[in-house]
Amino acid sequence: AAALTMARAGLDVMMVERGKFCGSKNSSGGRLYGHSLEKLIPNFAAEAPIERKITQERLSLMTEGGALSFQYGSDKLENLKYPSYSVLRSKFDKWLADKAEEAGVMLTEGFLVDELVVEDGKVIGVMTGGEEFDADVVILADGVNSLLAQQIGMKKELEQKDVAVGVKEVIELGEDVI
């Protein structure tokens, strides 16, 4: 979204993606709030790879010994002007990157940003594949365990007690089943 916005503003934008394609390194799905993306790409839901419209809300409060859940469903959730959707990030991110490319973003896939180029305390570019690329603006999007943010002191290294390993399985069900 940031690359697309900057390209539309007339800036030269290079997006560096570590994976084979944007989204290939994502292993999760998520919830996409339509009001934000609608501003960026009007009528996005007609073409974006969304899974389902969110029509129910559930909040669970969990303790070591149990859980208490609240569920809310309403016609209002089904008829919102800007509904929210479930998405698989690997599909959605690729679609959004394609939109950015259409707007003029130069996308380089299969490259890892090895380090940030810093001069006089300011980030002035990135090193990737042995080459240096100068930049007026660098936006880090390398995930929760950002080694680049650690390099410049923006965040501390995560401690083992602060992370967990998750397992995900995608089960495809037809609309008639859900």
Regions found by a protein language model. Name each.
Residues 1-2, 21, 145:
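Conserved Rossmann-like nucleotide-cofactor binding loop
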Residues 65-69, 130-132:
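Short, mixed charged/polar active-site loops
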Residues 3-4, 150:
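Short, hydrophobic alpha-helix immediately C-terminal to the catalytic nucleophile
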Residues 67-89, 125:
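Helix-loop-beta segment of a Rossmann-like dinucleotide-binding subdomain
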Residues 5, 9-11, 18-65:
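N-terminal FAD cofactor-binding segment of flavoenzymes
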Residues 9, 90, 95, 99-178:
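Predominantly flavin-linked oxidoreductase catalytic cores and closely associated redox partners
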Residues 25, 29, 84, 88, ...:
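Catalytic cores of large soluble enzymes that bind and process phosphate-bearing ligands
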Residues 4, 35, 94, 98:
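Surface-exposed charge patches
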